[in-house]
Regions:
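N-proximal low-complexity "stem/linker" segments adjacent to membrane-targeting elements
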Residues: 1-24, 74
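Glycine-rich, basic loop-to-helix element that forms the pyrophosphate-binding segment
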Residues: 67-70, 77, 84-105
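Acidic/His-rich active-site region of diverse nucleotide-sugar glycosyltransferases
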Residues: 76, 84, 93, 119, ...
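Short beta-strand-to-loop acidic/aromatic patch adjacent to the donor-nucleotide binding site
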Residues: 107-119
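A short, conserved alpha-helix in the catalytic core of glycosyltransferases
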Residues: 186, 191-210, 214-242
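Non-catalytic, C-terminal membrane-associated alpha-helical segments of glycosyltransferases
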Residues: 258-266, 276-321
Length: 321
């Protein structure tokens, strides 16, 4: 059984459309876990009402109380499980609620963590299952992410991490979707699976553990991929698994203050944890980040960046939100 985790935060319409696309998958051996991450816009009720209004003969919707999430055992007819978190502790924490729920189900074989602002090709899951069934050493597998607004152009096939600067970029971003790849070559070239579509084996999750909740936002996928590789799990890419992602080609200029702070602070967090020998090159590179904020007239963000740089060691363990 495949458990698909979809995290919602103030994005009911996207979540509903994501679930609708999942209902068209050409396999039936899956269940969908929707975790509402303490939305402030009545998302949970909107999702529940819309899904209940859909006429889907064999798809039963069940609400599981947050306090019962680790005790509930799914029934055969349960298809969509709704869980509402009482607080928002970030992307990793919200997804971990769904992942833990799946791990408590004896019939779980794989967990597919999927962004709510995605829609999937009907064969996307079939290809992921086939890929991981054929190579048991794969712990985490990614899809070919395609721009939702331009389905001829891919967003990426995994990601690459620059250790010196702790910057990341999507592998083969901007290429035509029609381009053919050797997935084994890609798997060797990438450093992490993009968080919009991460397909985990049960063995990987049981060995490596859950997503690290310290980050709150950004770098969670790099962290868990580095931990998986340290435990000798492979990262896989399945270029035949198409997932359409609604994110724009560039969103950096639109980051909120909190998101910008997380992206800066977490560069130091993950570097200190996995690549301490590069800590000072990453630290120095943040002067360029601060300068760019000032150049754009974002002086509050510039001050936050400098504050993180000069107080990181002192405030280690503090939240970025």
């Amino acid at each position: 059984m495949i458990y698909i985790v979809v995290l919602n935060w103030n994005g009911a319409i996207d979540t509903i459309n994501c679930v609708k696309s999942l209902m068209d998958l050409n396999v039936s051996d899956y269940k969908i876990i929707i975790v509402d991450n303490c939305s402030m816009d009545n998302s949970y009720d909107t999702i529940k009402e819309n899904l209940n209004s859909l006429y889907i003969a064999d798809k039963s919707i069940i609400e599981v109380k947050y306090e019962d999430r680790n005790k509930y055992k799914t029934l055969e007819h349960d298809k969509i499980i709704l869980i509402q978190s009482p607080q928002n502790n970030g992307y990793a924490s919200g997804n971990n609620i769904g992942i833990e729920f799946a791990l408590n189900q004896e019939n779980m074989k794989y967990v597919w963590v999927l962004n709510n602002d995605t829609e999937v090709d009907k064969e996307a899951l079939t290809h992921l299952i086939s890929k991981c069934d054929s190579d048991k050493s794969i712990g985490i597998c990614g899809s070919r992410l395609v721009y939702f607004a331009d389905r001829e152009m891919q967003q990426g096939l995994g990601g690459v991490h620059n250790k010196w600067l702790c910057t990341t970029k999507n592998y083969e971003m901007g290429r035509l979707v029609s381009k053919k790849y050797d997935d084994e070559v890609i798997s060797n070239d990438i450093d992490y699976i993009i968080g919009a579509s991460m397909f985990f084996s049960r063995e990987c999750l049981e060995t490596v553990g859950l997503m690290n909740e310290e980050y709150f936002l950004y770098y969670e996928e790099l962290d868990i991929c580095l931990r998986a590789k340290a435990k000798n799990f492979k990262l896989g890419i399945c270029s035949e698994s198409l997932v359409y992602h609604k994110i724009g080609a560039s969103t950096d200029g639109g980051k909120s203050m909190m998101a910008d702070l997380c992206s800066i602070k977490n560069r130091l967090v993950i570097t200190e944890r996995f690549y301490p020998q590069y800590y000072w090159t990453v630290w120095l590179s943040l002067f360029v980040v601060a300068f760019n904020r000032a150049r754009r007239g974002e002086f509050n963000k510039m001050k936050r960046c400098l504050n993180v740089m000069f107080n990181f060691k002192r405030n280690k363990g503090s939240k970025c939100h």
